Amino acid sequence: MHNTQSDTKCENASDTPESPTGEEESVGLARWKLGLLMFGNTLAVFCVALDNTIMSNAIPRVTQTFDSLEDIGWGSPARRHFDRQRERTTSPKTAVYGCFGGIGGAFAENSTWRWCFYINLPLGAVTTVLILCFFFDSRTGTSDVSMSSWNRFRGLDIPGLLLFLPTVFCLLLALQWGGAKYPWNNVRVIVLFVIFILAGGCWIFIQHSMKDQASVPPRLIRNRNVWSSAVYMGCIVGSFIIILYYFPIWFQAVKGGSPIQSGTMILPIIIGLIVWLGFGFQLPFIAVQTALPRSDIPVATAIVTFAQNLSEAVLVALAQTIFQNRLFAHVKQLSTLVDPNALVHAGAANLDQHFSADVLPEIVRAYSAAVTETFYAATGIAALSFIGLIRLQWLSVKKTKTNGNAAQTHL
């Protein structure tokens, strides 16, 4: 084990930037302001948790309301940073993330599933006010007012954003339609994939040409710790979100549970997330904050979060295609009396109200087999996270001071 800066400098520059020298002293924040800022941040995480846990339990009822099993994947959201001193703020946010898994079931069963969205409005308003009023740069105690409005506007990377949105839209729509609504060789699906490739190529070119001003700076993407963290985060979160979305379908379609019962039965998964599994979700943020200079941490953290959100949307759409294709295949194999179109329009809840008793057992078995095979895909995606994990540098989160400069401890 070596504790000198020379070990840090011997690493390739594209792999690990040198640790910052003379790190800025953080300016303190009054406890009452910190408390309100934590409360606003926790509300923001709570809103994200609502999108995931509420919608996962309400989606079977939503598919029944709109007579469309094809829309399972649309509910996917289209979160957390800490350093050594941030565990105290991260723990309550992680706990809040899983506290209300049954709320969506209660809304869907006793009120209306639309409240799954309405509830975000007041919470989002409170969050916005608190963050705007109390957030400041911990290094200087103020926001950066020296930057002109034009430079701030350029920093938004508007051209990249305008290209990225249709790129992701075409990919998601192609994955949702392919093999389900239309065959994979259908012209609509092919055109969507072609647009995705062309627009994606243009977006990559813009990111490369803008260099550090890009939304995703190429310099950071080439850093092994950043792309490894992004791969790990995308796979592990994508796998978890598939399980979170399809367990309620199994609970309601196979076990015949109500939305509230579904929210209760999924609590062991949520409790496991709070107690231990959530620990793995924080590893990429620890990695980039340990390996990179302080000036690069915000952008690198945003890249990891971007990979997380993108994987949620893409992998849920892919899982929907797998689920629906396998469901139709099992239904055709088990019973010739069931029309697949009738299965789509019935939705994933209250199957006994749509099908007779002589075909219902076959449909339930088909649902169970289709959900199980979707979980196989989630397991494979989780295994792919090791690709990112094994490429991370072996660094210690502890830092020592050498001649006033921060030095990384290599293991």
UniProtKB/Swiss-Prot annotation:
Keywords: Cell membrane, Glycoprotein, Membrane, Transmembrane, Transmembrane helix, Transport
A GO cellular-component term linked to this record: plasma membrane
Membrane topology summary: Multi-pass membrane protein
Extent of Polar residues compositional bias: 1-19
Annotated signal sequence range: none
Residue positions with a glycan: 12, 110
Transmembrane residue ranges: 34-54, 116-136, 155-175, 189-209, 231-251, 266-286, 299-319, 370-390
Compartments it resides in: Cell membrane
Spans annotated as Disordered: 1-26
Domain of life: Eukaryota
Chief site of localization: membrane
Disulfide-linked positions: none
UniProt cross-references to InterPro entries, sorted A to Z: MFS_Str1/Tri12-like (IPR010573), MFS_trans_sf (IPR036259)
GO molecular function, one term: transmembrane transporter activity
SUPFAM superfamilies: MFS general substrate transporter
Record function comment: Efflux pump; part of the gene cluster that mediates the biosynthesis of paraherquamide, a dichlorinated fungal indole alkaloid that belongs to a family of natural products containing a characteristic bicyclo[2.2.2]diazaoctane core.
Family designation: Belongs to the major facilitator superfamily. TCR/Tet family.
Protein name from the UniProt record: MFS-type transporter phqF
Gene source species: Penicillium fellutanum
Classification of source organism: Eukaryota, Fungi, Dikarya, Ascomycota, Pezizomycotina
Gene that encodes the chain: phqF
